[in-house]
Amino acid sequence: ANGSQNNAINFDGGNYSMETTDKLLDIEKWRDTLSKILQYYGNIPYRYGDVKTFVIISQGRNHFMLLHEGWQKRRHVYGTIVHAEIRHEQIWIYYDGIEDGITDELVAAGVPKDRIVLAFHPPDVREYTGYGVG
């Protein structure tokens, strides 16, 4: 024993460093935060027609979507309101149709701005958004 400390934690037979464990905890928190944000917006009724809102979450693949579908008079309404994914230790927002966006809510929940990628902007523009570049 040379006095050094082993900072590994054992989960289900796998060894994860403290840094990896912290990242896993962050990702779990981000999943919960994204789920709560989408559930909140999913509970807001559509104003016109017979249109329902759906929250679709693929925890295993880390995809989070808010969709609407239905009828407004004789017109079929269908579309993505929000699509986000947790990948490479960042939240990638592919589409955000919420009026003020969900980024402020993510930041208020403790997600660092450099961990949020506004993927609907071209890669060469992202560095000017104040968020992550991916």
Whereabouts are the PLM-identified features?
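Terminal domain-initiation and capping elements
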Residues: 9-134
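Accessible peptide chain termini
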Residues: 1-2, 18
